């Protein structure tokens, strides 16, 4: 049995501070539409010590809808954890769709692998156990113009998001989308100072404040910052 919705509200980062409204969204719109294998993976992940890293079910539906609306086929995922967003993407892609998934910890990915296999989408995924920057640099050298990617989703080490952006804005095609997760960071980015955070959390918070300012001024993309989950920023490449 997975964590209750009340537990979910307490342990997961969220922008929506009304737990009753969050429960309503999850129970009414998200969970009834959640794929069986995504539900199983979510329930397993909610028992994990790093369960707060789980992409929420309502955000998963948002990502799936966007991928389908774009008719995306080639995607990149940086930061996999147990693979909830990865499985979401794989299910949304067509049968010949491909995902290059990069994470430093394969053991977390292996938690989700049985659910990916049961869903019949393992063939769409190329998992690479590595730091992301060297892999992206290699991809930049090897990827031809006609093989650029349609979509990228980043949910990894927060201090490197700006570095990932510089690579992804070249790897994703013009008109393609780059999504950054957690960009509102509990809502704490609204304040110049936010006492009480763990030092690592504060580093991430400041990184996101800098990233948000940078993306808003980047002429290569147009952006929309969506207050779902812990905040998702969508960048559409312009040139």
From Swiss-Prot:
The prosthetic group or cofactor this protein requires is: Mg(2+)
- InterPro entries in the record: Cation-dep_OMT, SAM-dependent_MTases_sf, SAM_O-MeTrfase
What Enzyme Commission number(s) does the record list for this chain? 2.1.1.336
Q: Which residues bind S-adenosyl-L-methionine?
A: 55, 77, 79-80, 85, 103, 132, 157
Q: Which GO terms describe its molecular function?
A: metal ion binding; O-methyltransferase activity; S-adenosylmethionine-dependent methyltransferase activity
Q: Does the keyword Phosphoprotein apply?
A: no
Going by the UniProt record, its keywords in alphabetical order are: Alkaloid metabolism, Metal-binding, Methyltransferase, S-adenosyl-L-methionine, Transferase
Instruction: Write out the GO biological process terms.
Output: alkaloid metabolic process; methylation
UniProt function note: 4'-O-methyltransferase converting norbelladine to 4'-O-methylnorbelladine. 4'-O-methylnorbelladine is a precursor to all Amaryllidaceae alkaloids such as galanthamine, lycorine and haemanthamine, and including haemanthamine- and crinamine-type alkaloids, promising anticancer agents.
Q: What is this protein called?
A: Norbelladine 4'-O-methyltransferase 4
């Amino acid at each position: 049995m997975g964590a209750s919705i009340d537990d979910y509200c307490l342990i997961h980062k969220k922008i929506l501070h009304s737990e009753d409204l969050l429960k309503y969204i999850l129970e009414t719109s998200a969970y009834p539409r959640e794929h069986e294998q995504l539900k199983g993976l979510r329930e397993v992940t909610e028992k994990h010590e790093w369960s707060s890293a789980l992409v929420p079910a309502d955000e998963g539906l948002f990502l799936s809808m966007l991928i389908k609306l774009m008719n995306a086929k080639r995607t990149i995922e940086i930061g996999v954890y147990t693979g909830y967003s990865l499985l979401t993407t794989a299910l949304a892609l067509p049968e010949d769709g491909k995902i290059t998934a990069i994470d430093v910890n394969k053991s977390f990915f292996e938690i989700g692998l049985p659910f990916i296999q049961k869903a019949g989408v393992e063939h769409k995924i190329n998992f690479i156990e590595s730091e992301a920057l060297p892999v992206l640099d290699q991809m930049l050298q090897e990827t031809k113009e006609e093989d650029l990617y349609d979509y990228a989703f980043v949910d990894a080490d927060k201090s490197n998001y700006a570095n990932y952006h510089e690579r992804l804005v070249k790897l994703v095609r013009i008109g393609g989308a780059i999504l950054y997760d957690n960009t509102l960071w509990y809502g704490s980015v609204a304040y110049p100072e936010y006492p009480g955070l763990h030092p690592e959390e504060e580093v991430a918070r400041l990184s996101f404040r800098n990233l948000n300012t940078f993306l808003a001024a980047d002429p290569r993309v147009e952006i929309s910052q969506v207050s779902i989950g812990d905040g998702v920023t969508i960048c559409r490449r312009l040139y």
